[in-house]
C-alpha cells in the first residue's frame, strides 16, 4: 500500500487527490495547504484524510512514501527537492520547475537516491494522444514532416512563469512522445502586455536534423480557446482537436506529390484530397491512466 502526501489543494489538487483515493493500492494519508478554507472543502469530500496548514507535517511523516507537489510553479523546485532528500518519491505538476538548471538538479537527486521523479504531463495518458502515437508508429501517415500546435485562450495569466512554461509544456511533451528525435535548434520569441515582464504571447520553433520542423503558438490573450495539434506526414495527416467532445482525432488522407519538370525547370504539384477517418478512442480521464 503506497501512502501519499499531497501539497496543495487549489485548482488541480482536488483532481490529483480524487484519483489517488480511487486507487486500490494507494492511500492518501495527508493533504497540506496554507488555506484552511480549502482544507475544509477537502474534508467535506474526503473526511478520513488528515489535513494540515503546515507542509512540514507531510515531509516529516515517516509513513508517507510519495509526495505530490500541486502548488504554484515557483514552489515546485523547493518542495520537490525537499521531498526527494527526505527519501520520498515525487509527482510534480507541470512545469517541473521555472528553469532548466533546477530541473536537472532534481533529476540528478532522484537518480542518486533511486527515487521516482515524475512530471504530471497529463496529455500523454489520454486516449487521444495514445491513438495518435499508435497511428504514427504504424507508419500510416508516413514520415512526419512537420507538427503545428496552437494552445491559446483568454487567460489564465500566471504570476511566476510565462506562457511557454505554462502552456507549451503540454505540446512539447506530446511532441517528444510522438517522435524519438530531439531538436537540433530551438528558437522562441514572445511579448509581454502587462507590467510584470512575463510573456503572455509566445511562439516556439524546433528544428531537427531530419528536416522535421515543429511550431507552437501559445497565448493567454486570445478571444477564443483553441487546443489543436496538426501532425503532417508525407502520406497522411492527423489533426488533434482537444476542444472536440468526442471526435478529437481525425486522420486526413490528403497531401501532395512533387513532380519535377526538368524541361520547364519548375516543380509541379499534384494534390490528393482523400477521405477523413475518425478512429475510435477511449475517452477516459487521463489521471486514471
Predicted regions and their residues:
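Residues that mark the start of a beta-strand
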Residues: 3, 143-146
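Rossmann-like dinucleotide-binding domain that binds NAD(P)(H)
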Residues: 154-224, 230, 244
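Beta-strand-loop-alpha-helix segment that lines the small-molecule cofactor/substrate pocket
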Residues: 66-124
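Basic phosphate/pyrophosphate-binding loop/patch that engages nucleotide-derived ligands
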Residues: 108-116, 130-144, 236
Amino acid at each position: 500500500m503506497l501512502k501519499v502526501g499531497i501539497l496543495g489543494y487549489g485548482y488541480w489538487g482536488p483532481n490529483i487527490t480524487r484519483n489517488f483515493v480511487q486507487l486500490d493500492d494507494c492511500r492518501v494519508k495527508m493533504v497540506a495547504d496554507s488555506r484552511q478554507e480549502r482544507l475544509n472543502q477537502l474534508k467535506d469530500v474526503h473526511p478520513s484524510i488528515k489535513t494540515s496548514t503546515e507542509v512540514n507535517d507531510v515531509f516529516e511523516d515517516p509513513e508517507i512514501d510519495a509526495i505530490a507537489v500541486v502548488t504554484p510553479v515557483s514552489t515546485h523546485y523547493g518542495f520537490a527537492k525537499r521531498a526527494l532528500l527526505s527519501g520520498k518519491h515525487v509527482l510534480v505538476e507541470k512545469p517541473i520547475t521555472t528553469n532548466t538548471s533546477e530541473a536537472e538538479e532534481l533529476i540528478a537527486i532522484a537518480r542518486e537516491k533511486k527515487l521516482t521523479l515524475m512530471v504530471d504531463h497529463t496529455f500523454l495518458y489520454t486516449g487521444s494522444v495514445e491513438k495518435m502515437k499508435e497511428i504514427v508508429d504504424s507508419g500510416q501517415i508516413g514520415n512526419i514532416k512537420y507538427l503545428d500546435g496552437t494552445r491559446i485562450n483568454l487567460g489564465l495569466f500566471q504570476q511566476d512563469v510565462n506562457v511557454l512554461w505554462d502552456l507549451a509544456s503540454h505540446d512539447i511533451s506530446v511532441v517528444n512522445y510522438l517522435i524519438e528525435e530531439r531538436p537540433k535548434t530551438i528558437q522562441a520569441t514572445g511579448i509581454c502586455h502587462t507590467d510584470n515582464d512575463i510573456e503572455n504571447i509566445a511562439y516556439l520553433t524546433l528544428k531537427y536534423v531530419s528536416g522535421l520542423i515543429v511550431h507552437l503558438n501559445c497565448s493567454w490573450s486570445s478571444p477564443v480557446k483553441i487546443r489543436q495539434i496538426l501532425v503532417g506526414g508525407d502520406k497522411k495527416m492527423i489533426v488533434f482537436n482537444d476542444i472536440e467532445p468526442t471526435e478529437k482525432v481525425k486522420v486526413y488522407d490528403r497531401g501532395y506529390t512533387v513532380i519535377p519538370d526538368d524541361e520547364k525547370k519548375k516543380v509541379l504539384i499534384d494534390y490528393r484530397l482523400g477521405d477523413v477517418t475518425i478512429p475510435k478512442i477511449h475517452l477516459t480521464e487521463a489521471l486514471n491512466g
